[in-house]
Curated annotation (Swiss-Prot):
Entry binding sites for 2-oxoglutarate: N202, T290
Role: Dioxygenase that can both act as a histone arginine demethylase and a lysyl-hydroxylase.
This protein's name: Bifunctional arginine demethylase and lysyl-hydroxylase psr-1
Lineage: Eukaryota, Metazoa, Ecdysozoa, Nematoda, Chromadorea
Location in or out of the cell: Nucleus
Organism: Caenorhabditis briggsae
Required cofactor names: Fe(2+)
Segments for region (Disordered): 334-383
Biased composition range(s): Low complexity: 345-358
Cofactor detail note: Binds 1 Fe(2+) ion per subunit.
Gene Ontology MF terms: histone H4R3 demethylase activity; metal ion binding; P-TEFb complex binding; peptidyl-lysine 5-dioxygenase activity
Domain JmjC: start-end pairs: 146-310
Documented EC number(s): 1.14.11.-
Domain of life: Eukaryota
Length: 397
């Protein structure tokens, strides 16, 4: 039975939440948000935590690049958030008080427009919902809005990810790259690969996230739910855990696509290398921050995808890199995907290369062999970002 207005603590919560739900997922109007009873029945099997963990204070940037970023090996880094103000400021109590009247993105409508809710109503919903796949705050514009930009001062980008080559592009032209993330149990992200060949990092401040990562070469049809399994929640993490996860854990799962599983806890930072499939579900109330980035180690993957998917951005970015980081041009020049005349023409790059004001983002649904020196390319589709709900980011880690 759907949550009634008497279950919320604020008098307007029911109306505000119902309005957001109607805009974000109108297809559930008749079916209902809690019909499957996952709040009571969802119980994944015991975790097999197989990810390496490394003390982030005891490894250098060069060692990280050599051991994890270059070979594209997922890892959890510990200790990187120890001195963040977010540890004290990102509690549910403080967030719901300081930002109570600020709107945060918790979905998208059928036209790609942001669905937003005031923090005070989302907090009420977060604590009291029984939904099968709850609304999830995934907000990429928090650092640009005057009344929420303080959130960006509560954390700092870890040293391993500071050299983001997209920083050299004008801010309004680069794709969305950072998200404030907040959600209850059963919220999460469907299986996806991060956009434009980027890698991602995700630092968790509150709660626990369950991750499954699958190697880049795994076929899309193998890692995605089958058509008959999608039901009313086709693009939700909980659907994946109720369907594909059972196959992933079975002895019949191909050994060449062996998954990495883990439970990320408070203060831990997940590194997701370029191309890895990953799916996330929150085990309880969670608060996190996540960024997508391009470095010298994954530029050979990012550049061909950017040329193909965001050609005007690629021309602008190339000019900026030539001015500020000319040493990386040899990586770009080695990419056979780069059209020889595309970087020197005089066409404008001010329109389609600009990122949307609605937190949208480009992405792929499958491993795209868009690395330097490789010619075969698969079709791009829309999916999502580093740890991002497909319903929320359907255009863009």
């Amino acid at each position: 039975m759907s949550l009634g207005k008497d279950r919320y603590s604020l008098p307007r919560s029911y109306k505000r939440v119902s309005h957001a739900k109607e805009k974000a997922r109108p297809e559930l109007r008749k079916f209902g948000w809690d019909t499957l009873g996952y709040a009571e029945s969802f119980n994944p099997p015991p975790l097999k935590d197989t990810i390496p963990r490394v003390d982030g204070k005891k490894i250098s940037v060069d060692e990280f690049r050599r051991d994890f970023e270059r070979p594209r090996i997922p890892v959890i880094l510990t200790g990187l958030t120890d001195d963040w103000n977010a540890h004290e400021k990102w509690t549910l109590e403080r967030l719901s008080k300081k930002y109570r009247n600020q709107n945060f993105k918790c979905g998208e409508d059928d036209h790609g427009n942001s669905v937003r809710m005031k923090m005070k109503y989302y907090h009420d919903y977060m604590l009291n919902n029984r939904d099968d796949s709850p609304l999830y705050i995934f907000d990429s514009s928090f650092a640009e809005r005057r009344k929420t930009k303080k959130l960006s001062e509560d954390y700092k980008v870890p040293k391993f990810f500071e050299d983001d080559l997209f920083h050299y592009a004008d801010h309004k032209k680069r794709p969305p790259h950072r998200w404030f993330v907040m959600g209850p149990a059963r919220s999460g992200t469907a299986i996806h690969i991060d956009p434009l060949g980027t890698s991602a990092w995700n630092s968790l401040l509150l709660g626990y996230k369950r991750w499954v990562l699958i190697p880049p070469n795994a076929p899309r049809d193998l890692v995605k739910p089958m058509a008959h399994e999608k039901g009313k929640h086709p693009d939700e993490g909980i659907t994946w855990f109720q369907t594909v996860y059972k196959r992933v854990r079975s002895p019949a799962w191909p050994k060449e696509y062996a998954p990495i599983e883990c439970r990320q806890g408070p203060g831990e930072t997940m590194f997701v290398p370029s191309g890895w499939w990953h799916v996330v579900i929150n085990e309880g109330l969670t608060v996190a921050v996540t960024h997508n980035y391009c470095s010298v180690e994954n530029l050979h993957l990012v550049w061909p995808k950017t040329v193909r998917g965001r050609p005007k951005l690629s021309k602008h970015w190339h000019r900026k890199l030539a001015e500020s980081r000319p040493e990386v041009l040899k990586i770009i020049n080695s990419c056979t995907d780069t059209p020889p005349q595309s970087l020197n023409d005089s066409s404008s790059d001010s329109s389609s290369s600009s990122s949307s004001s609605d937190d949208s983002s480009d992405s792929e649904t499958e491993e795209d062999s868009g690395r330097c020196g490789l010619g075969n390319r698969k079709r791009r589709n829309d999916v999502c970002t580093s740890e991002c709900p497909e319903k929320i980011s359907n255009s863009m880690v």
